[in-house]
């Protein structure tokens, strides 16, 4: 399992991602019940040319994670109605088609250890972590691509 990274500070430099015209669009499932956080994250991620699908509760997210739609990354809050984010990650890690998918926990509560135990690759603390999304996702996707080569 990949070592969990915790990022809680502000970043001074601006990060950007390279989107190649022939490259497939990155697809992200974002599970977040706070409309403001979901909107800000969507704006940041879509500015990179990435496709974002948002779920507002854990039960709907559980169905999507269990389904066959391909996601390049799961971005999950912990405090959700229905199934919590750590339960979603634990479930996803048990699925053949999701076990290698990069997973990021973006949460307000200090649950780094619990996120590690559940199988998260990275823990980002709200609100500071929102500014680290692009850099973090680029790094995780780059690491996954190297593993696949």
List each model region and its residues:
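Conserved acidic carboxylate
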Residues: 32, 107
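Acidic, metal-coordinating helix/loop segments flanking the phosphotransfer/catalytic sites
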Residues: 54-73
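Acidic catalytic/metal-coordinating carboxylates
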Residues: 57, 84-87
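Active-site residues of response regulator receiver
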Residues: 76-77
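Short amphipathic alpha-helix used as the core "switch/output" element in two-component signaling
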Residues: 86-99
């Amino acid at each position: 399992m990949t070592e969990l990274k915790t990022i809680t500070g502000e970043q001074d430099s601006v990060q950007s991602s390279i989107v190649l015209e022939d490259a497939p669009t990155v697809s992200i499932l974002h599970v977040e019940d706070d409309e403001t956080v979901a909107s800000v994250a969507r704006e940041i991620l879509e500015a990179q040319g990435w496709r974002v699908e948002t779920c507002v509760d854990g039960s709907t997210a559980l169905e999507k994670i269990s389904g066959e739609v391909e996601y390049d990354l799961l971005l999950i809050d912990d405090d959700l109605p229905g199934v919590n984010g750590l339960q979603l990650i634990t479930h996803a890690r048990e699925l053949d088609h999701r076990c290698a998918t990069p997973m990021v926990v973006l949460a307000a509560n200090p649950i780094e250890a619990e996120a590690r135990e559940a199988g998260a690759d990275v823990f980002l603390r709200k609100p500071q972590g929102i500014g680290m999304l692009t850099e973090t996702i680029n790094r995780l996707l780059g690491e996954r691509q190297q593993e696949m080569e």
